[in-house]
């Protein structure tokens, strides 16, 4: 006897009084056709409400009214949230300005005029995500980093810009390296465009490329054998952050099928990683830089992860 037959047999012989009573569904032919069509529904073929019965149509329209009200409230919430964030961004600015002065020795704060050496480099390397992006070659250039700032591009949008302020150094001419993120909010937050600074490297100082020396054996006398050949290749560097992945413009693509083809999984992963790094800098590093410098933020983050694990364990129990 199969498991299914055993179950049926047990149900017949057992007391049905302790089984939950399931109300019968009054489904007519029209509703059956509706369920079949909904099952085969695709995003490219929206369901026609006119095919419903008058009673069900009335209910669906009422549900749509509820959804409209919800969307209006959500839009109001996001606007008020954006305004509140803008207000507090302005309150934070004087504090970040004082931090800049102390880190860079502009004011004494009962310390030496040299400020806090390698403040931002150490703070960044304490964060695991950022540390993974920084190579040993990068460190010499990042020692010239004076400040990292975040600002809104437009007060009522999710667009934001990160600015890295550098002292005069031996690596590049730019005093500021920036990265701007444009987010489309019309149909939910979608990363639309990312713009990074073109770094003006001094000759022989580019950290995003490396020169590879190869030996090419040439036929002939021994004196001309093993001629050294040089080749420039891309290499890992934090400064690749300012050269973001290129996002295809939707307007330039014929339809969403073509867009999905262009947006390969690899490109999507690169975009996600790039955005995660930017948000980490904006939401974690900049507001709590001194805690990352001292390592306290790392301890707090570990404690937060432990609490999340405990909460998950309780839910599973």
Curated annotation (Swiss-Prot):
Span-the-membrane segments of this chain are none
Region span, Disordered: 297-317
Entry similarity comment:
Belongs to the nucleosome assembly protein (NAP) family.
Q: Name one Pfam family in it.
A: NAP
> What ranges does the record list as Acidic residues composition bias?
298-317
Complex and partners: Can form homomeric and heteromeric protein complexes with NAP1;1, NAP1;2 and NAP1;3. Binds histone H2A.
Q: Name one GO cellular component term.
A: nucleus
Q: Would you tell me the protein name for this molecule?
A: Nucleosome assembly protein 1;4
Q: Where is the motif Nuclear localization signal annotated in this sequence?
A: 214-219
Q: Which GO annotations describe the biological process of this protein? A: double-strand break repair via homologous recombination; nucleosome assembly
Instruction: Assign the protein's first listed, main location to one coarse class.
Output: nucleus
Q: What is known of its domains?
A: The acidic domain is probably involved in the interaction with histones.
Q: Return the motif ranges for Nuclear export signal.
A: 52-67
Q: Which function does this protein serve?
A: May modulate chromatin structure by regulation of nucleosome assembly/disassembly.
Q: Which UniProt keywords apply?
A: Chaperone, Cytoplasm, Nucleus
Q: In which tissues is it expressed?
A: Expressed in the root segment covering the apical end of the differentiation zone, the elongation zone of the root and the mature pollen within the anthers of open flowers.
Its subcellular locations are:
Nucleus; Cytoplasm
Q: Which domain of life is it from?
A: Eukaryota
């Amino acid at each position: 006897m199969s498991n299914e037959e055993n179950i049926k047999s047990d149900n017949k012989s057992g007391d049905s009084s302790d089984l939950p009573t399931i109300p019968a569904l009054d489904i007519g032919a029209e509703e059956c056709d509706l369920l079949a069509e909904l099952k085969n529904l695709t995003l490219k073929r929206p369901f026609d409400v006119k095919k419903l019965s008058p009673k069900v149509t009335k209910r669906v329209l009422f549900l749509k009214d509820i959804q409209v009200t919800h969307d209006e409230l959500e839009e109001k919430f996001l606007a008020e949230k954006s305004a509140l964030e803008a207000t507090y961004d302005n309150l934070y600015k004087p504090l970040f300005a004082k931090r800049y002065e102390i880190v860079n020795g502009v004011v004494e704060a009962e310390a030496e005029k040299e400020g806090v050496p390698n403040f931002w480099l150490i703070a960044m390397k304490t964060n695991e995500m950022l540390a993974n992006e920084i190579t040993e070659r990068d460190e010499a250039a990042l020692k010239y980093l004076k400040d990292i700032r975040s600002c809104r591009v437009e007060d009522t949008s999710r667009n934001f810009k990160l600015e890295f302020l550098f002292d005069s150094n031996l690596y590049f001419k730019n005093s500021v390296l920036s990265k701007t993120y444009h987010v489309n909010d019309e149909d939910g937050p979608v990363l639309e465009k990312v713009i990074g600074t073109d770094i003006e490297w001094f000759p022989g100082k580019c950290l995003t490329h490396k020169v590879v020396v190869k030996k090419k054996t040439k036929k002939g006398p021994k004196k001309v054998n093993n001629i050294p050949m040089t080749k420039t290749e891309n290499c890992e560097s934090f400064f690749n952050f300012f050269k973001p992945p290129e996002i295809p413009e939707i307007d330039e693509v014929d339809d969403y099928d073509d867009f999905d083809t262009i947006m390969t999984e690899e490109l999507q992963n690169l975009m996600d990683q790039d955005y995660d790094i930017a948000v980490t800098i904006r939401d974690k590093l900049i507001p709590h830089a001194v805690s990352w410098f001292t390592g306290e933020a790392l301890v707090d983050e570990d404690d937060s992860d432990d609490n999340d694990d405990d909460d998950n364990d309780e839910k599973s129990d």
